[in-house]
Amino acid sequence: MSHFTGLTEDTSMQCRASAMIFDIDFHPTRDFIAAGLVDGTVELWTTPSNDNSSTASSSASSSNTSTSSSSSSVSTTAIVAPRKVLTMKHHTKSCRAICFDQQGAGLYTGSSDQSVAAVDAGGAVVWHVSGAHKAPINVIRPGPTGTFFSGDDDGCVKVWDMRQQESVMSLDLAKDFIADITFNDNYTRAVTASGDGTISIINLRQQKLMHTTEMFEDDQLSILLMKNGTKVVTGTQSGALNIWAWGKWDDLSDRIPGHPQSVQTMIKYDEDTMLTGSSDGIIRIVGLHPNKLLGMIGEHEEDFPIEKISLSRDRNLVGSISHDDCIKFWDVRAMTDAKGRGSAGVNFADMGNGDGNGDDDDEFFGGDDDDMDESDDDGATTAASSSSSNNNNNNNNNRVMFNKGEGSYKIKRMTIKMVVVMDFLMICNYV
């Protein structure tokens, strides 16, 4: 069993919000991350990036010491730390759910005050519905252009159309809270996970419930479509990952044990690899078929539970939140390199991402104008989940450690080796 030894807590960089964070989401086209807070505030932050000017100046001086540099495995490049660029307050209670639209032109938020809202590219609230649900809203997910999905604490899921500025679908799916929602990539099907132990499959064309599984004793807390839409994976209260084969809902096709506590949040890294956040405070890498706990990315201090993780647009950073009011950023490019090379030894080059100029733009969200493909496809069961399968697969072969220095942050180039852990119990205890 492989362990990504280089992905440890000292690779993190963090920004501190003004209150405890309930939800985060990376911008789909630009280097921002949005956070919904317990006091109803929404904050927008930049993500860590290279300071190219510092890189250029340091390269000149380093050329004079090429002999010593070649014998050393460490060189430095300044990093621009995250900074808050926008604060909004349009909910009276906690902002539990937040997501950018698919194009990045706007932001959707949901609150325990039962309201939903849409924020435009300039940070202005352009649409707000009080009493959007009869219960506090627990999850919001983006849909096709101009739409989004919301789920509440009573098991109701709604679809909202910004063009009509109203709900166009409402289904009572569960007897407890809707924990998570995922989709096939042409949005003909949605699958929900609920605190009553069920998952529900929705036909979005016909706007009706197709199937609800039997109730498990475990809460279903997070959900993904994997293997090009042929597998549904849920994270549970007990820590096991439940796996269904698409269309065979009467029983599980497989199960992955190993998490000692509940799996609150999951993201798809690729069709075979998931990242999980658990209540034991650790972010893990999990392989699917073969089913393995591959390693860990890091953890928050004091064993705080991981409440949410999110993947950046270029898949270079994972953002995570816990109960410490911080967004932590974890560099995962080493994981991409290790998966691509299948090598025991990996050398990493320069980061080379982000302009790091810190410019403030009038429109913080301004995304691409291209509409997503909404073509219908009856073969929905083979489609992949959401937009992560379309992400740029560029491999920078890089490993970054963010270390706080005297007012600046530095990158250290390193060589990371994968080690084999023979004892499964050791992984369970230490990963």
Question: How should these model regions be labeled?
Answer:
Residues 24-30, 98-105, 110, 140-146, ...:
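Loop/turn segments within WD40 beta-propeller blades
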Residues 13-40:
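Beta-strand-rich domains and repeat architectures in extracellular enzymes and scaffolds
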Residues 11-16, 52-56, 76-90, 126-132, ...:
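Short C-terminal beta-strands that terminate individual repeats in beta-propeller domains
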Residues 20, 29, 84, 91-94, ...:
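WD40/WD-repeat beta-propeller blade-loop signature
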Residues 19-22, 39-44, 93-96, 105, ...:
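Short coil/turn segments within WD40 beta-propeller repeats
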Residues 30-34, 104-108, 115-117, 126-128, ...:
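Structural hallmark of WD40 beta-propellers
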Residues 48-50, 120-124, 162-165, 204-207, ...:
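Short loop/turn segments that connect beta-strands within beta-propeller blades
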Residues 1-8, 58-69, 219, 254-255, ...:
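Terminal intrinsically disordered, low-complexity extensions flanking WD-repeat/beta-propeller proteins
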